[in-house]
Amino acid sequence: MSLLQFSGLFVVWLLCTLFIATLTWFEFRRVRFNFNVFFSLLFLLTFFFGFPLTSVLVFRFDVGVAPPEILLQALLSAGCFYAVYYVTYKTRLRKRVADVPRRPLFTMNRVETNLTWVILMGIALVSVGIFFMHNGFLLFRLNSYSQIFSSEVSGVALKRFFYFFIPAMLVVYFLRQDSKAWLFFLVSTVAFGLLTYMIVGGTRANIIIAFAIFLFIGIIRGWISLWMLAAAGVLGIVGMFWLALKRYGMNVSGDEAFYTFLYLTRDTFSPWENLALLLQNYDNIDFQGLAPIVRDFYVFIPSWLWPGRPSMVLNSANYFTREVLNNHSGLAISPTLIGSLVVMGGALFIPLGAIVVGLIIKWFDWLYELGNREPNRYKAAILHSFCFGAIFNMIVLAREGLDSFVSRVVFFIVVFGACLMIAKLLYWLFESAGLIHKRTKSSLRTQVEG
């Protein structure tokens, strides 16, 4: 890449970054937090944060990258995607009408809410316990990270349930919403994330997500400033780099350490070059339509129920890795959100996907606002826990693609909804057995006076 070509790419990158950052800043000033702000920051991180890192790798370490025209296509496609997304998100689908009292779809009380978070936590802890009994601490047993996807590891499906520890702790926080509950959320979820990091053999997702949710809650409540957020972000990047070194068993120093930091940080937070690599192989793609979305549900079907289930699920990531790049290393290369749309339908699917994503984020913000307006604090805690718990799925959306997001968010909704139903059933059984006594104002007054 020549200096002139880099200058042209830099101008495009700068304009796109300023465009998205400016809109995000105005939205932040207006509401302080919503899921549009979160997704916008996530989009910036995924598609634009990596450009400076790539530039240093190219000019400092002479690393090969896709041709400049392909990199330009990647930057422009990301900028255009966000423009369509933003217009869709801001478009009002119906006229605003005065709030009319409606019969709520469901309601929650104190016992049901506490039962819900206990069940969610139980699912996570039991899954971790069973996985540990089968495999032990994989971080200290396996020689390479790719081995966690091999037949040596049993009970892989259980990993999908680990994440429900975070929504459980979110319910605990939203029931109190004070600084002690906020710090308890951080300590408990990060400790659980470190435990799963050692047991699974290097998966950092639970740690990243717990830390991100902690920071956003702090921003919402005014407990941390933007400067503190930036400092925490730098600390998070360094922490993720250290965990990556441990995961891959690397011992580096000097220039090699700087080089390793650049490419691991880029691959962890901003896999934008994967999109460029996919666009470089555009002519080799046999568009898959909506099949990757359907195929991604295969992983949730146990083999005993479907003996002929394919051993390799050909979602957009696996199709890109195996069929387009002919890479059979065992690790799937993340195609990113835009890349998954290209795999499904080419360039035409990019604006269509942007419209779909705009509606998805709009729906999450509607739920979030519903929780903000909800007078029943127990129901509000459940709604907020569901919304913030879905942050993991939004990260999957940006990094892995629309197909992976759809299957995971449906799984999340089903499990979360099942926990709610079980909690309500248990409450009904306990109440029928006379084990639950409703609090009265007189008893509460007596407790206060005592």
From Swiss-Prot:
Pathway: Bacterial outer membrane biogenesis; enterobacterial common antigen biosynthesis. It is found in: Cell inner membrane. The keyword Membrane applies. The keyword Transmembrane helix applies. Keywords: Cell inner membrane, Cell membrane, Membrane, Transmembrane, Transmembrane helix. Pfam families: WzyE (PF06899). This is Probable ECA polymerase.
